[in-house]
C-alpha cells in the first residue's frame, strides 16, 4: 500500500513489474510454490497499477536435461495463474530470453515460442520484447508483426562485442551491434502503443558509475540511438 501510494503521489506510470515466472522445479512441491509465488506477484502488480507482469519463465531444474519437460512445466504454470491475472486486470507478459540463458533462466527462447503460448493462454496474455534477447532471431520481423497489440512491454539496451557476461554486461543503446531503431520501427509498425521504449541495463560496469551521470548518458543515448 505504501509503495502504491508513493507511486501515485509521484505521478509515475508503472510499465511493468519484473518479474514472475520461474516455474520449473524438481518436484511437485517446488512447482506448487512457484505458482503461489506468481499469484502473489499478480496481486502486487495489481496493487501498484502495473501495466503487466513480466515473466522470466525459468530454466532447467537442478540436475535435469529434460528441456521438453521444463517447457511443459512453464506451460502448466502459466495456465494455473491466468484466471487470477484476468480477474486482477494484469497482463501476463512472456519475455523470451536469449538461448544462451536457456539452461538457468528461461526455456522460452524465441518470440515465436512466446506467441505460441499466448495463443494457448488467450486473453490477458502478451509478450515483453527485449532487444537484447531477440535481436539475433532471423524470424524476428515476422514474429513482431504476428505479435501486434500483444506487445505489452518493449525493452532496449545493446549487445556488446565481446560480451563478458550474458546477464550482467549489457551495453547502453549505441554501444553494441543491435540495430535498435530498426527493431523499434518493427514494434511501432506492429501496433505497440505502450508509449515507452524502456532502457534496461543490467551491467556491473555501469552500476559502478555515478547514478546521476549514468542517467544523463541514458537520456542522451535514448534520444540518439533508440
For the regions a protein language model found, what residue spans apply to each?
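A structural motif
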Residues: 12, 45, 50, 151, ...
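Histidine-acidic metal/acid-base catalytic patches
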Residues: 8, 108-129, 135-226
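Glycine-rich, flexible loop/turn motifs
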Residues: 19, 103-104, 169
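Aromatic-lined substrate-binding rim segments of carbohydrate-active enzymes
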Residues: 2-11, 16
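Active-site acidic/histidine proton-transfer and metal-coordination neighborhood
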Residues: 8-9, 24-126, 136, 209, ...
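A cross-family glycoside hydrolase active-site/sugar-binding cleft signature
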Residues: 15-20, 53-56, 93-97, 128-132, ...
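Short active-site-proximal "capping" loops at secondary-structure junctions
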Residues: 1, 19-24, 204
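Conserved radical SAM core fold
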Residues: 20-25, 60-62, 160-166
Amino acid at each position: 500500500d505504501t509503495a502504491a501510494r508513493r507511486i501515485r503521489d509521484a505521478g509515475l506510470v508503472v510499465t511493468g513489474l519484473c518479474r514472475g515466472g520461474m516455474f520449473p522445479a524438481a518436484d511437485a512441491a517446488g512447482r506448487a510454490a512457484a505458482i503461489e509465488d506468481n499469484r502473489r506477484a499478480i496481486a502486487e502488480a495489481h496493487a501498484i497499477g502495473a501495466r503487466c507482469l513480466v515473466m522470466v519463465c525459468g530454466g532447467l531444474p537442478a540436475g535435469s536435461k529434460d528441456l521438453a519437460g521444463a517447457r511443459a512445466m512453464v506451460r502448466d504454470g502459466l495456465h494455473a495463474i491466468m484466471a487470477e491475472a484476468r480477474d486482477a486486470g494484469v497482463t501476463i507478459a512472456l519475455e523470451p530470453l536469449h538461448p544462451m540463458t536457456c539452461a538457468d533462466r528461461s526455456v522460452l527462447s524465441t518470440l515465436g515460442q512466446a506467441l505460441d503460448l499466448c495463443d494457448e493462454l488467450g486473453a490477458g496474455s502478451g509478450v515483453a520484447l527485449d532487444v537484447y534477447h531477440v535481436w539475433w532471431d532471423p524470424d524476428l520481423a515476422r514474429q513482431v508483426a504476428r505479435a501486434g497489440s500483444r506487445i505489452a512491454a518493449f525493452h532496449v539496451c545493446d549487445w556488446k562485442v565481446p560480451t563478458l557476461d550474458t546477464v550482467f554486461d549489457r551495453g547502453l543503446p549505441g554501444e553494441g551491434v543491435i540495430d535498435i531503431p530498426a527493431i523499434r520501427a518493427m514494434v511501432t509498425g506492429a501496433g505497440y502503443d505502450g508509449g515507452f521504449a524502456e532502457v534496461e541495463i543490467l551491467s556491473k560496469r555501469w552500476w559502478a558509475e555515478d547514478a546521476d551521470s549514468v542517467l544523463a548518458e541514458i537520456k542522451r543515448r535514448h534520444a540518439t540511438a533508440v
